[in-house]
C-alpha cells in the first residue's frame, strides 16, 4: 500500500475528522484504494484512508469548502502556490492505534510506494541492533 506524506498540522486535522479535503497541486490516480497517511518528517504511519474523488478547485469551491480544507489562504494566494490546485476528497479515515514507522526513501516528497509499516519494538530492534 502506498503512503501520502502530509505535514503534522494538516494530518492532525484529517485524523480528527475536521479536514476532509487535502489540497494538492495536481490530480492523482490513486482513487478508491486504501493508502497510508504518513506524517512528514517523523517516519510515522498515522492512519489510513481512501481518496474518494479528485477535482480541480475553483474560486467558488475554495470559498464554499473552507470548512473542509481548513486552509486560511485567499484563492489568489492558493493559485500563487499551486498553478493547478486540486481537492482530494478523503474518506474512510482511520487513525492507527499503535505507533508505526516506515522507511522513508530519499527524495520522497508526496508519495512513498509500497510502505511496509513496522511497530515501535521492531523499529527499536532495527535502530539499536537488538
Model-found features: residue ranges?
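Structured alpha/beta reader/binder surfaces that contact nucleic acids or chromatin modification marks
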Residues: 1-130
Amino acid at each position: 500500500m502506498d503512503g501520502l506524506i502530509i505535514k503534522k498540522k494538516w494530518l492532525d486535522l484529517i485524523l480528527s475528522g475536521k479536514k476532509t479535503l487535502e489540497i494538492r497541486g495536481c490530480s492523482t490516480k490513486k482513487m478508491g484504494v486504501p493508502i497510508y497517511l504518513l506524517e512528514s518528517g517523523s517516519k510515522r504511519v498515522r492512519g489510513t484512508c481512501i481518496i474518494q474523488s479528485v477535482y480541480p478547485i475553483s474560486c467558488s469551491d475554495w470559498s464554499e469548502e473552507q470548512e473542509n480544507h481548513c486552509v486560511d489562504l485567499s484563492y489568489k494566494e492558493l493559485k500563487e502556490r499551486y498553478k493547478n490546485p486540486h481537492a482530494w476528497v478523503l474518506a474512510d479515515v482511520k487513525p492507527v492505534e499503535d505507533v508505526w514507522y516506515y522507511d522513508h526513501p530519499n527524495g520522497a516528497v508526496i508519495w512513498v510506494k509500497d510502505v511496509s509499516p513496522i511497530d515501535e519494538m521492531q523499529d527499536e530492534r532495527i535502530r539499536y541492533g537488538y
